[in-house]
Amino acid sequence: MSDPSRLARRSLLTGGAVLGAGALAAACTSNAPKEDAAATQNVASGGDNDKPGAKVTIGFSAPAADHGWIAAIAKNAAAQARRYSDVTFQAVQPTNDINQQISAVESLIAKKVNALVILPNEGKQLNQVARKAADAGIPVVNLDRVFPDKLSYRTWIGGDNYGMGVAAGHYIGRKLKAGNASNPVILEIQGIATLPLTQERSKGFADALATYGYKVTARQDAKFTVESGNQVAGNLLQAHKKIDAIWNHDDDQGVGVLAAIKQAGRKDLFMVGGAGSANAMREIKAGGVLEATVTYSPTMASSAVRIARLIAQNKGMADLVEQEVPQSITLASETVTRDNVDRYLPLGFES
C-alpha cells in the first residue's frame, strides 16, 4: 500500500451497484419498525444466486459492538443471512478479548460449520485459529482486518484504507491549495495507531498531501472511542492556536472530536471525517466545521455473508465470467460532501 503510483487507483466492489440499489430500496420502502429498518438497510438481492440452494451453516465472529461501525457490521451480517432460507446463521458472543474470540471461533470449527465470516480483533493474533479452520476444510471469509497468512482465509473483503487516506488528503489538499495556503497546519487523528489499517490510512493521507506540497503537522490516535476523540482533540486544539484542517479517521470517535471543536469555539479550521456515519452526514448537510467524510462502509458485512454462502454452495459470482468467488474484494472509498450527501445518507450507520 506504500507505492505512491497507487494514488489514482479506484478499487471496485463487484456487484456494488446492486448492493447500493438494494440498500437504498430497503431504506426507502421498509414498513418495519425504525430499529428493524436500520438493521436491514444494508442488504441486497440479485440474480439466480439468490434462489434457494443447498442448506449451509455460516458462523460469524466479530469484536464487541462498542461503537456504531462495529454494531452496524453485526446488524448487516445478521440481516443479510435472514434473507436466505438456505442459511443457518450462527453468531458467537462478540468480544474484545483476543483469547475469548479464539475460543469462540474454535467452537464454530468444532460444530463443523460450512463457512466462517471473521472480523478479528487483530489479524495477527487470530491468524492461527483462522488457519485451523481452513486446514479443517472450512472456508474463511476474512472481513476487514486481514490475516497475514493467505492460507488462513479463502476470501478477504474490506475497505480501501489507503484509499481513505488518499481521498481525505485530496479533499484537504485541493481546498488549501485553492486558498493559496502556505505551510498550513494539518492535524490527523487516527483510530488505533498499531493496526495495519490505520497505518495504511496515514500513508495514503501523507502521499496525497505530498502531491500538493503539504505534510501532516501533528498526528495522534484516539482509539475509535468518543471519549478519546474528545480528549485527543481537546489537547491538539490547545497545542495549536492556528489550525487549517483536521482529518479524523473515524466518525464514531469524531462525535467527541466535533464536541471538542465546538466547545473550544474554533472556527479557523475545517474537518474531514472517515467511515460515513449518518450523524457525520447530517453534520455535513447542516454546514459547519465538518465538510466531508470518506466512506468505509459496514455494508462489507452484508457482502461477506453473501460471499460465504456462495463459497459454501460452490457457486461463483453471477456478474463474473470466472467460476469461483475472487480471493479479495476491496470496497471503493468515496468522498461524501454537502453536494452529494443526500445520496449517501440512507447508507449511513448511527454512531
Residue positions per predicted region:
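Bacterial lipoprotein signal-peptidase II cleavage site
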Residues: 28-37
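Hinge/cleft segment of the Venus flytrap/periplasmic-binding protein
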Residues: 36-56, 189-193, 197, 209, ...
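Extracytoplasmic "Venus flytrap"
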Residues: 43-46, 50-76, 80, 84, ...
